[in-house]
């Protein structure tokens, strides 16, 4: 199980990403707009740099909802591979069966 501090840090990052998503999207649109003047685009770039570093969605890490494991996490379930296996064998994930051919 991952340390609680790491899990909480990821939750904090998720909140920051959600909080600044609109502002970030607006600034990115201004930066990418060729119709705007160079000065406007430059000022938008400076504003984007002033946003918190953790407001960037690329800094988020997918973690298992149960254990906090950072690797081997399936996006569809939000769980690590070993927890998916345990829960699937118990039959607690509807529609998921063990493959056999």
Swiss-Prot record:
SUPFAM superfamilies cross-referenced by the UniProt entry: Glucocorticoid receptor-like (DNA-binding domain)
Keywords: Ribonucleoprotein, Ribosomal protein, RNA-binding, rRNA-binding
GO BP annotation list: translation
Any one GO MF annotation of this record: structural constituent of ribosome
GO cellular component, one term: cytoplasm
InterPro entries, sorted: Ribosomal_uS14, Ribosomal_uS14_bac/plastid
Subunit structure: Part of the 30S ribosomal subunit. Contacts proteins S3 and S10.
Function: Binds 16S rRNA, required for the assembly of 30S particles and may also be responsible for determining the conformation of the 16S rRNA at the A site.
Family: Belongs to the universal ribosomal protein uS14 family.
Protein name: Small ribosomal subunit protein uS14
Organism this protein belongs to: Cupriavidus metallidurans (strain ATCC 43123 / DSM 2839 / NBRC 102507 / CH34) (Ralstonia metallidurans)
């Amino acid at each position: 199980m991952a340390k609680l501090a790491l899990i909480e840090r990821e939750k904090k990052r998720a909140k920051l990403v959600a909080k600044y998503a609109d502002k970030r999207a607006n600034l990115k649109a201004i930066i990418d707009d060729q119709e705007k003047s160079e000065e406007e685009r430059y000022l938008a770039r400076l504003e984007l740099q002033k946003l918190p570093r953790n407001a960037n969605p690329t800094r988020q890490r997918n973690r298992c909802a149960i254990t906090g494991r950072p690797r081997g996490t399936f996006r569809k379930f939000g769980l690590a591979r070993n927890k998916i296996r345990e829960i699937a064998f118990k039959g607690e994930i509807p529609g998921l069966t063990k493959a056999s051919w």
